[in-house]
UniProtKB/Swiss-Prot annotation:
The keyword Nucleus does not apply. Pfam families: RecR_C, RecR_HhH, Toprim_4. May play a role in DNA repair. It seems to be involved in an RecBC-independent recombinational process of DNA repair. It may act with RecF and RecO. SUPFAM superfamilies: Recombination protein RecR. It comes from the Bacteria. The lineage of its organism: Bacteria, Pseudomonadati, Pseudomonadota, Alphaproteobacteria, Rhodobacterales. The gene is recR. Residues 81-176 form the Toprim domain. GO terms for biological process: DNA recombination; DNA repair. A zinc finger (C4-type) spans 58-73. This is Recombination protein RecR.
């Protein structure tokens, strides 16, 4: 039986639904906010309300923005011939943080998964083929995870784009910067060895 007031318990229950937060972590976070950090509560609530009212998926690429077409898709500074395919918005943001890709993106919204009954129609794969043709893409870069589902999705996309004349490439896989071989799994070492290049 909880001793917290109903409103506070509701907040704890809602926060416990967030990834990485269980009931205990959510309770600690709420107590943190109710302690010496109460000044964060109002701006946090306002920010969440604003996001709930303004955030929407880009109709073109699937990124999250505040208009129907996101800033990346409307930017004239972005290369129009390259489309980087990512699993989700978190991956797009990671690519943007790296600051090296200057093309456009396509967010799939997941990966193909027979186990979870996720097919191409749920993943915006048909939209990718349409974009590749209509936007005159010259290269599709597959930036998907090195998981079984990620690689299955990559192969499916490559097959779906056959006959379009668009080059399909994927990110290199292997030893991370600062990584030591002793700490890597066999699959990573195998991928790194197969993707080796001249030094």
């Amino acid at each position: 039986m909880s001793t917290a007031p109903k409103d506070i318990e509701t907040l704890i229950d809602l926060m416990a639904r967030l990834p990485g937060l269980g009931p205990r972590s959510a309770r600690r976070a709420v107590l943190f906010l109710l302690g010496k950090n109460r000044r964060l509560l109002a701006p946090l609530g306002e920010a969440m309300t604003a996001v709930a009212q303004t955030a929407r998926d880009c109709l073109n690429c699937g990124n999250i923005g505040t208009s129907d077409i996101c800033d990346i898709c409307t930017s004239e500074k972005r290369a129009t011939g390259e489309i980087c395919v990512v699993e989700d918005v978190a991956d797009l943001w990671a690519m943007e943080r790296a600051g090296v890709f200057k093309g456009r993106y396509h967010v799939l919204g997941g990966t193909l998964s027979a186990l979870d009954a996720v097919g191409p129609e749920e993943l915006r794969i048909p939209k990718l083929r349409d974009r590749a043709v209509s936007e005159g893409a010259t290269e599709i870069i597959l930036a998907l995870g090195a998981t079984v589902d990620g690689q299955t999705t990559a192969h499916y996309i490559a097959e779906a784009l056959e006959g379009t004349g668009v080059a399909v490439t994927s990110l290199a896989q292997g030893v991370p910067i600062g990584g030591e071989l002793d700490y890597l799994d066999d699959g990573t070492i195998t991928a790194a060895l197969r993707a080796r290049k001249s030094f």
